[in-house]
Regions:
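Structured catalytic/nucleic-acid-binding cores of DNA maintenance enzymes
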Residues: 1-264
Length: 264
């Protein structure tokens, strides 16, 4: 599932092609057809990312909601002539400069601002947003008996963090993923927020996940293989000390950690 940096990057890149323009909204697959008709031909005012969610604000006040889930994917085609759809395209957004197709998304719907606000109200602060309130996430973690590896995947605690960033951020701070939130100090959790924010921002800039310190670890250009730009995630050995990496199941996903650098 795409992590928060991908969603913010999509909002930025797609916004340049769609925002401020009249957009033809269709559903080649048909599942989104009735919703598409509500905004077809209208001007798109804004694309707002929040955690792993995308919200499309239309000129008539309606708001589109997309959550990619595990299998959702966008395809961007530049030019003023829309190509033939490839596969099961749920939503197609076409302007005079580009066509953007969405397939396989967990959620693709048109609603109201109240619908959008209700979704956001269930989410924790998003480190990539200017209006984020870190204290809310820190308060929830420091009072919780849940393990840190589960808390960081809980989108009601902190929004946008996925399996890679949780493992890497916990490693940087030497926190074992099974340590309860209330066994961490407030200062530890505040610094963890800072690290997560920096990692996510770098992800938006690079359009890929690189968590290692580039000053110490050379990162190859182009497409990365798993483990080439991480300390513990999807690695056999810890990048720092060489200890075999272990995993623990938390939040329904395996969390990678180094038993030497992240003692219990």
């Amino acid at each position: 599932m795409p992590e928060g940096h991908t969603i913010h990057r999509i909002a930025r890149d797609h916004g340049r092609l769609l925002v401020g323009r009249s957009v033809a909204v269709t559903s080649p697959q048909g599942r989104f057809a009735s919703d598409a008709a509500l905004v077809d031909g209208l001007v798109l005012d804004r694309i707002e990312p929040y955690g792993k969610h995308l919200f499309y604000e239309w000129s008539n006040g309606l708001v589109g909601h997309v959550h990619l889930g595990l299998f959702g994917k966008f395809r961007v085609h530049l030019g003023d002539v829309p190509p033939a759809p490839i596969g099961m395209v749920r939503m197609r957004l076409s302007t005079d400069v580009a066509t953007i197709d969405l397939a396989g998304a967990n959620t693709c719907a048109i609603g109201t601002r109240d619908d959008r606000d209700a979704i956001v109200a269930r989410l924790g602060p998003d480190p990539l947003r200017r209006d984020a309130k870190p204290a809310l996430a820190v308060d929830r973690m420091v009072r919780s008996k849940q393990p840190m590896g589960a808390l960081l995947l809980d989108q009601s605690v902190i929004s946008g963090v996925g399996n890679v960033y949780r493992a890497e951020a916990l490693f940087v701070h030497g926190i074992h993923p099974s340590r309860p939130g209330n066994a961490c100090t407030r200062d530890e959790l505040e610094q963890l927020w800072v690290t997560i924010t920096a990692m996510l921002r770098r992800g938006v800039k690079d359009n890929r996940i690189v968590t290692v310190d580039r000053r110490l670890v050379p990162v190859p250009k182009g497409k990365l293989r798993r483990g080439e730009a991480t300390y513990v995630y999807h690695r056999d050995l810890c990048l720092r000390c060489g200890t075999p990496i272990q995993t623990v199941e938390l939040g329904g996903r395996p969390c990678y950690f180094c038993p030497h650098c992240q003692p219990t």
